[in-house]
Amino acid sequence: MNQDRTVLLVVHTGRPEAVSLARAAADRLHDAGIRVRVLRSEADELALASAEVVEASGDAAAGCEIVMVLGGDGTILRSAEVARTTRTPILGVNLGHVGFLAESERDDLAATIDHVVHRRYAVEERMTLDVTVTLDGVVTARQWALNDASLEKSARERMLEIVVEVDGRPLSRWGGDGIVASTPTGSTAYAFSAGGPIVWPEVEAILAVPLSAHALFARPLVVSPRSVIAVELLQHYNAGPGVLWCDGRRTESVPPGSRVEIRRGDLPVRLARFHQAPFTDRLVRKFDLPVHGWRGRVRRERREPELSADLRNPPDVDAAP
């Protein structure tokens, strides 16, 4: 056993398929001399006798060269909670539906493990969001998000009254279901469902998308990654608390009068990639977008006839005969 190489497995143990694939992956990694580590909350279901068991804490991936995830985007977001502080790359094997964050599919498990064994992958960094909640100048919560952070109403029968600020200047006030702030990575998730734009991952920006706003000016915003977006939850006679959701997983109660500040995170999340396909191709594949009829520039150029020498070098019509 090569004691210097360790892979942390994070598994959606609620899926029997994921458990069986995790066992197969552990066997292959063990045969290659790579130690396997699992989270204590998943250890009983996985029943891997040779695996090291650790708590699901911020240092769970310490000493691991990669975090291999078997599940959907939700499982990958969960794995980011244990991989971010140690800057360990995450490699997702999609067992869910869209699986936008995943790098491979269930049928490619053997090839994926081969990439891990031979270290044939690149690592890209994805920006995150840092979120701070204050009330009367006192910090009441700190959170972070890889995909998005949303401030939403906590009661169905009430609207959330908010004022949005960008870089210290008030922008607009509205009532509605709330607002979602997103990274480019999260632009294909909640923000997309709320009507926000898709932003290519190499573009650094922060998105702010209103949720069912009752206002004339309530449009999706795209601001600089250096900007700070602040959302103030207004107080009025029947105002109820809001709820801050980060990546749809971690929640904080936000009382009326609170201020939520969203800025670029100090720690990015690292994703392992071994497919060099353009992001456009990933969009087409994941969303099953219709592209039939596309000819493409290269294909058109190949069909263009070669110009004759006379056409390439036309005579000077102004020249004397």
Go through the PLM ranges and name each one.
Residues 14, 73-75, 98, 185:
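Short glycine-rich anion-binding loops that position phosphate/pyrophosphate groups of nucleotides
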Residues 1-66, 107-122, 133-143:
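ATP/NTP phosphate-donor binding region
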Residues 159, 169-217:
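Gly/Ser/Thr-rich active-site loops/lids in small-molecule metabolic enzymes
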Residues 18-19, 74-79, 187-193:
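Short glycine/serine/threonine-rich phosphate/pyrophosphate-binding segments
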Residues 151, 167-170, 219-321:
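ATP/nucleoside-binding phosphotransfer catalytic cores, i.e., glycine-rich phosphate-binding loops
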Residues 35, 87-91, 207:
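Proline-centered loop/turn at the N-terminus of a beta-strand
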Residues 98-177:
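Catalytic core of DAGKc-family lipid kinases
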Residues 83-96, 100:
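Gly/Ser-rich helix-loop-strand patches that form or flank binding pockets
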